[in-house]
A protein has these predicted regions:
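Acidic, metal-dependent phosphodiester-chemistry machinery of nucleic-acid enzymes
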Residues: 18
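Bacterial N-terminal signal peptides
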Residues: 1-7
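Sec/Tat signal peptide C-region and signal peptidase I cleavage site
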Residues: 9-14
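Sequence context surrounding c-type heme c attachment/ligation sites in exported
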Residues: 21-151
């Protein structure tokens, strides 16, 4: 005699989704990890730094992968920025509400930055790597200037 266990066959409902503050926290963790990897690279590229290309490439590849995932941590329910509100730096968003009305641009920016980081991870020489990291820093700074509220 066979025993069958009935399992629901319907997709996850909204109540099965993480709370918006949990998603905001997750994206802050991911952004912190991107920043940490970028800091490692920029420290190696500083005048007093020592570039170990293989290590820097690994950091760039990690950044590329993280940037591919990053826009997916901005579901509409996390559009919660309010001017003048008291904020918990861990779970409250600083994302500009305009990000969601122009999400395609945000997604494109993250994709382009990911591709630059990937190209850096594949660079064969320091003189190829260095300008790509400069481009990546410019992309990061431009995206932050556009999409991050400072209140």
């Amino acid at each position: 005699m066979a025993l069958f266990i009935a399992a629901p066959m319907n997709p996850a409902s909204a109540q099965d989704q993480p709370a918006p503050k949990d998603t905001i926290f997750a994206r802050k963790i991911l952004m912190g990890a991107i920043d940490m990897n970028m800091d490692e690279i920029e420290t190696m590229l500083a005048p007093e730094g020592k570039l170990v290309l293989a290590d820097a490439q690994e950091h760039a590849e990690t950044i590329s992968t993280m940037l591919m995932a990053f826009p997916h941590l901005f579901p509409p329910a996390t559009n919660q920025w309010k001017p003048g509100a008291d904020r918990d730096p861990a779970t409250d968003t600083f994302a500009n509400p305009d990000l969601w009305s122009n999400f395609a641009d945000f997604y494109r920016r993250a994709t382009e930055a990911s591709k630059i980081a990937w190209s850096a991870s594949q660079a064969k020489r320091a003189d190829e790597f260095r300008p790509l990291i400069g481009q990546l820093r410019q992309r990061c700074d431009a995206c932050h200037a556009l999409n991050m509220k400072t209140d």
